[in-house]
Swiss-Prot record:
Annotated keywords: Aminopeptidase, Cytoplasm, Hydrolase, Protease, Serine protease
Record's protein name: Xaa-Pro dipeptidyl-peptidase
Record localization: Cytoplasm
Recorded GO MF terms: aminopeptidase activity; dipeptidyl-peptidase activity; serine-type peptidase activity
Reaction(s) catalysed (UniProt annotation): Hydrolyzes Xaa-Pro-|- bonds to release unblocked, N-terminal dipeptides from substrates including Ala-Pro-|-p-nitroanilide and (sequentially) Tyr-Pro-|-Phe-Pro-|-Gly-Pro-|-Ile
Classification via SMART domains: PepX_C, PepX_N
Organism: Lacticaseibacillus paracasei (strain ATCC 334 / BCRC 17002 / CCUG 31169 / CIP 107868 / KCTC 3260 / NRRL B-441)
A cellular component term, taken from the record's GO annotations: cytoplasm
EC primary class: hydrolase
GO biological process entries: proteolysis
Active site: S370 (charge relay system), D490 (charge relay system), H521 (charge relay system)
Family indicated by similarity: Belongs to the peptidase S15 family.
Role: Removes N-terminal dipeptides sequentially from polypeptides having unsubstituted N-termini provided that the penultimate residue is proline.
């Protein structure tokens, strides 16, 4: 086990003492050592209400091989050895003597686990207080810090009773759980937008669900975590509308210029406002939906309000879904504008009674994963006031990069046949309300047909519809600070979405952080080896509470999880830069790779059907030596590595080839070859319900990325796809003459990948990708000019 920690601060001793007193500990350096140890260790069992109960708890802790903590305290000690203190500390942190560590040498385990410690014996009360302060900020076996663990057991439950008025509590630069999340005020409002996406002549009203600390009713104003979540009110069965992968790749007769595919913002409609008949300070509707994001729940107990809004076309709101269109961005912005006092909302949909977010400080962070993170990124690119930061996990920065690639229809990994129209149906939760649907069904079906037409599955080309869903175009407008989190094995929302957005905001005068993990499309807030919750606590305390805690400097710019060394996260200045830390090597495919042939015929669709494969089994087989697809691919290998190497950046392919057809699909996979136990792409559960989000509150599982039980022969590092009629970009077309050589350039997905010595790099070049592209029936023959082809690989040195 490794408990990496990036968010721990080390303030000077006076600040440490003041903070210890602020959380209710007896922390006077002038007290005797004996009295201080008794007071402090007794305080560490808040679940024990009497001295007798506390003494029993103390008797369960071993100081060394000879005595318990209760017996040791009874001797009124005047000092404590470093070893004895950390024997006690480890048990308080949830580790077991004899099982997890040796009482004769706790430091061996602490070093391996990356736990901090003082380097000397405790010979004074000041030493003790320093050790206790460090202990409170040390991570437990249960992922959270020790102070969080104490608070989860009731240590801070009476904090507000001792204050003249409700307030936030900060410790070590981070806000603490001194609010009872169980008592949160739950309410619903309807925010008036500027849009009419369902074409009924009225401004769409957008439902927003609010959970705010009860202390706001006593005058406390709080910042807001806002999650724009299209799934919040449920999803629909999309089996009937999911596309069957087409069997013919169209020959494109014409392309377009950049100007022709550039979308121009539409002029806002001049719509009448909903009538106003009064104002209220209390909502009329209870929020019946439960919060569905543990990250938000964690901060609700720390004095942040949490707001969810599903947006246009969802249950209890007006409008139609647009799958990432400007209307969905505007819907998220409308919620922020209400939270900052710049837009009206109503207590119900009909009476015209307005309500303000009077409890809000007007400081907002957007959070969430996938579609939720996508809308956070989209809102940030508007430059809306009040949005201080986004914490965007696996978000889409351009919808073309989600459903298309280089002139091809390319489904997100794991969702073959999905497209923008399918997702629109999936999230159109208005249809769950029959009384609502009967009034809009015909208009919705007409609207959906427009999405199906405009997404253009026939050519897969980039057009104005996709351009309107490219948020990177407006990245220069971003004013909010940005945290991006992404899985390096996320083939659903591929890593290019994060890295291209990261590059687009690189020169902006904002703070920005990037976290890259070895998972697929998953959260990392409950991954034990990373202190992600503390990192974001430090960040949000700075961003939303205005605390000068140095978060922008303390937190690394880039944190990357290693794919070989278990539970290892490394800090870097940037991704794929600066130049002094990176080098690129261009490898010729003929002289630097071994290949049995330079040609293949793509029989993948026939093989897929004959093998009764699935998308998942195909993805395994296409990168496995000697699989059923061996004749439908080109397999190129390099010699085994003599030393460890780390790829970091965007692999780039230059390829000269000829095909025997006027159109074709080319897919490329970069492979780590060699039998090994590699990390699973989904973190495994290590403690069911082990992460507590607040005192007597919700829990979630603690997870960890682990090597698989069985070795595998290969692992996908990166991949890319291209329609060979689009060698330059996704909108210009180049005619293919069968049998005549032509050249293409192809960027693969960004990666950070540690290759151990002894492994081999392999390059797999093939045609149709059964898991993601369409599945042509017609076979195509590919002839690769290896001597005039190369791949450029970026390395961190």
């Amino acid at each position: 086990m490794k408990l990496n920690q990036f968010a721990r601060l080390t303030p000077d001793f006076k600040v440490q003492v003041a903070e210890l007193k602020q959380i209710g500990l007896q922390a006077d350096p002038d007290d005797t050592f004996s009295q201080s140890t008794t007071d402090l260790f007794n305080a560490f069992f808040p679940e024990a209400y009497t001295l007798a109960a506390k003494k029993d708890k103390l008797a369960q802790v071993a100081v060394n091989m000879d005595q318990t903590l209760a017996a040791w305290l009874a001797k009124k000690p005047s000092k404590m050895t470093r070893r004895d203190f950390y024997n006690v500390a480890l048990q308080l942190l949830g580790f077991e003597a004899f099982t997890d560590f040796d009482l004769n040498d706790p430091f061996k385990m602490m070093t391996a686990t990356k736990l901090p410690s003082l380097d000397h014996d405790l010979t004074s009360t000041a030493d003790l207080l320093k050790a206790v302060y460090l202990l409170l900020n040390t991570r437990t076996k249960h992922l959270v810090s020790y102070l969080d663990d104490l608070a989860n057991r009731g240590f801070l439950k009476d904090f507000q009773k001792k204050q003249k008025k409700p307030t936030h509590l900060l410790f070590n630069g981070k806000v603490q759980q001194v609010f009872d999340a169980r008592q949160a005020v739950r309410e619903v409002v309807w925010i008036e937008s500027d849009m009419d996406t369902d074409h009924d002549g009225q401004r769409d009203l957008l439902e927003a669900t609010i959970y705010r600390p009860k202390a706001t009713d006593q005058g406390l104003k709080v910042p807001v975590l806002f999650t724009a979540n299209p799934y919040f009110h449920g999803t629909n069965d999309v089996t009937a509308v999911t596309h069957v992968p087409e069997t013919t790749l169209a020959v494109k007769t014409h392309g377009a210029s950049k100007a022709e595919v550039t979308a121009n913002p539409e002029e806002p409609a001049n719509l009448p406002h909903h009538p106003v008949n009064g104002e209220a300070t209390q909502a009329e509707a209870y929020a019946e939906e439960n919060g569905m994001y543990a990250f938000n729940d964690y901060f609700l107990a720390r004095g942040f309000a949490v707001v969810y809004s599903a947006g246009v076309g969802t249950r209890y709101s007006d409008g139609f879904r647009t799958t990432g269109g400007p209307e969905e961005t505007d819907g998220a912005v409308a919620v922020i504008e209400w939270l900052t006092g710049k837009r009206r909302a109503f207590t119900n949909r009909t009476d015209g009674i307005t309500i303000k977010a009077w409890w809000s400080t007007g400081l907002v962070a957007m959070t969430g994963k996938s579609y939720l993170a996508t809308l956070a990124m989209a809102a940030a690119t508007t430059g809306v006031d009040g949005l201080k930061t986004i914490v965007a996990d696996a978000g889409i920065s351009s919808w073309y990069d989600y459903y298309r690639e280089n002139g091809l229809v390319v489904a997100p990994g794991g969702f073959q046949g999905e497209d923008a129209d399918v997702l629109a149906v999936d999230t159109f939760s208005r249809q769950k309300s029959g009384g609502d649907l009967i009034n809009i069904k015909q208009a919705w079906e007409k609207h959906l047909a427009t999405i199906t037409h405009d997404q253009d599955r026939t050519t897969g080309a980039y057009n104005t519809w996709w351009d309107a869903r490219n948020y990177r175009k407006n990245a220069n407008k971003v004013k909010a600070d940005v945290v991006l989190i992404h899985g390096l094995n996320d083939w659903n929302v591929k890593p290019t979405n994060a890295i291209k957005f990261w590059e687009a905001i690189a020169d902006l005068p904002i703070q920005k952080k990037l976290v890259l993990h070895q998972g697929q499309h998953v959260y990392v807030h409950n991954v034990r080896s990373l202190d992600f919750l503390d990192m974001m606590n430090l960040w949000l305390t700075h961003e939303l509470l205005g605390e000068a805690n140095g978060a922008e400097d303390v937190l690394p710019n880039v944190v990357v999880q290693d794919n070989v060394a278990v539970q290892t996260w490394s800090a870097y200045q940037n991704f794929a830069s600066p130049a002094a830390e990176h080098v690129t090597n261009t490898r010729n495919l003929k002289t630097d790779f071994e290949a049995a042939t330079d040609q293949f015929t793509d029989h993948a669709t026939a093989t897929f059907d004959a093998q009764h494969d699935t998308s998942a089994s195909f993805e395994t087989a296409i990168i496995t030596p000697n699989s059923a697809y061996a004749n439908s691919r080109l397999w190129l290998t390099q010699p085994p590595l003599e030393r460890d190497q780390t790829l970091e950046g965007i692999p780039h392919l230059e390829l000269t080839l000829a095909i025997d057809a006027p159109t074709g699909i080319l897919s490329v996979r970069l492979i780590d070859l060699g039998m090994a136990k590699r990390f699973g792409e989904t973190a495994a559960t290590v403690a069911l319900n082990g992460l507590q989000l607040g005192f007597d509150y919700k829990t979630t599982d603690i997870l960890e990325f682990k090597p698989t039980a069985k070795p595998t022969p290969s692992k996908l590092i990166s991949l890319g796809h291209i329609n060979l009629q689009n060698p330059k970009n996704a909108y210009e077309v180049q005619r293919i003459t069968p049998g005549q050589p032509f050249h293409i350039s192809l960027d693969l997905q960004p990666t950070h990948y540690h290759l151990p010595a002894g492994r081999q790099l392999a390059l797999v070049i093939h045609g149709a990708d059964m898991a993601q592209t369409i599945r042509p029936i017609k076979t195509t023959h590919y002839q690769i000019d290896l001597a005039n082809s190369s791949i450029t690989l970026p390395y961190r040195i």
